[in-house]
Amino acid sequence: MKSDWKWDAFDPPERRVAEFLVQGKSNATICTEVFLSRARVQECIKRILIKTGADSTRGAIALLVEERETLSLLRVLQQATDGVVIIQDRLVKFANTALERIHGYEPNGMVGIPLVELMPPGSRNTTIKHYELRMRGEPAPTSYAIRILCKGGQEKDAMVASAGQISYCGRPAILGIVVERM
């Protein structure tokens, strides 16, 4: 599966140059540390701009800093005891270990799954309705009881709470918390 993370698109020299740019290092410093040629540094920065989709070095740095902060937050969310999910384009983009356990998936087994496949048919309309309302920035319930569908086909009762719309990889997404109800 193709990664959404800009850092993953860089080859090793680009990654080193990007690290130096994020740290605020000058082109002269980058020349001495990575390339001995100013032209090669400039060419590498051009490739970084293309791969990040930024129109300036400052814009690329801002995107990379935001991405790094997001990755740090995801590492924290991975440790949460409640299920945490990020949904973007109606697909699971992030699911922590607790959510994978609740749904019966192996680690990293939920990324890429359509949201509707995690709900039994009777819960799908409600879930999609709440997702669409949040994506449009309209009011939606902050928490609600729902049935979820596990990997093996069994259904469980759960509580879903949404933090609402967030930015994930530079685009709108929904952050949700799922707690299994016993």
Where are the predicted features?
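PAS/PAS-like sensory domain cap-loop motif
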Residues: 99-110, 121
